[in-house]
């Protein structure tokens, strides 16, 4: 499971709109869709369904949103802890 797939999935789950999610992620819609489809294949089913021009989470999508939201939050905490552990002396110097 790759983190960009999780990020793309969570962004679409939040917006329920592939166009807006693609804009927010600074990628094209096909670039956004492929990783989400692969993520769904990893879990064994579709994460979203389209109905009359609207995007909805499937039951699998709703369940995975909970779990993957925690994965995303944990990865952000890990990054913050790593930065804190390294301290200010390890920050990159920009000239």
Language-model features: where?
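Interdomain hinge and pocket-entrance segments immediately C-terminal to HTH DNA-binding domains
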Residues: 53, 83-95
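A short LG(V/I)-centered, amphipathic sequence patch enriched
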Residues: 40-62
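Alpha-helical linker/hinge and terminal dimerization helices associated
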Residues: 42-43, 63-86
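Short helix-boundary/capping micro-motifs
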Residues: 12-31
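Base-recognition residues in the alpha-helical recognition helix of bacterial helix-turn-helix
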Residues: 7, 34, 49
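The N-cap/first-turn positions of alpha helices
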Residues: 2-8, 29, 54, 61, ...
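Residue cluster at the C-terminal edge of the helix-turn-helix DNA-binding motif
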Residues: 15, 24, 37-46
């Amino acid at each position: 499971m790759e983190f960009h797939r999780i990020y793309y999935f969570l962004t679409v789950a939040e917006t329920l709109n592939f166009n807006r999610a693609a804009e927010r992620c600074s990628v094209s819609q096909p670039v956004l869709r492929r990783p989400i489809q692969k993520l769904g294949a990893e879990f064994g089913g579709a994460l979203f369904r389209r109905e009359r021009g609207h995007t909805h989470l499937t039951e699998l999508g709703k369940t995975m949103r909970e779990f993957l939201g925690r994965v995303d939050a944990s990865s952000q905490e890990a990054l913050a802890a790593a930065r804190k552990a390294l301290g200010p002396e390890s920050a990159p110097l920009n000239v």
